[in-house]
Curated annotation (Swiss-Prot):
Keywords: Nitrogen fixation. The gene is nifW. It comes from Burkholderia vietnamiensis (strain G4 / LMG 22486) (Burkholderia cepacia (strain R1808)). It holds the Pfam family NifW. One of its GO terms (biological process) is nitrogen fixation. Homotrimer; associates with NifD. This is Nitrogenase-stabilizing/protective protein NifW. Belongs to the NifW family. The lineage of its organism: Bacteria, Pseudomonadati, Pseudomonadota, Betaproteobacteria, Burkholderiales.
Length: 112
């Protein structure tokens, strides 16, 4: 395991990642979008055609750039608009539940 990978294992919060990579951030944005930022960051890393493995500095710079890009997505937009998580991808985050389905899920009157 590379020294960078070893250090990344100890990061847990969005703030940890942003501070580690030196990405300036507004705490208000992170408070609302922390999970979205991290998920988008990892999506960008997976989508990248080639990730430099020749030097730690190149790898660090690539990761920093992708994290900054993910953070910027949520400065300019909202989690619902970015649709990072499946709940936002499914029919614009809405699911149809019929009244009949709701009635069927309720206990029968006179019981309980």
């Amino acid at each position: 395991m590379t020294p960078l990978a070893e250090r990344l294992k100890h990061l847990s919060s969005a703030e940890d990642f942003l501070q580690f990579f030196g990405v300036p951030f507004d705490q208000k944005v992170v408070d609302v979008c922390r999970l979205h930022i991290l998920k988008r960051f990892f999506q960008y890393i997976r989508q990248q055609a080639s990730i430099p493995q020749d030097t730690e500095a190149a790898l660090f710079a690539t990761y920093r750039d992708q994290l900054a890009r993910a953070y910027r997505d949520f400065v300019a937009s909202t989690p619902a608009e970015e649709k990072v998580f499946k709940v936002f991808q499914d029919v614009d985050g809405r699911q149809h539940v019929s009244v009949d389905t709701l009635r069927a899920s309720l206990p029968a009157r006179g019981t309980a």
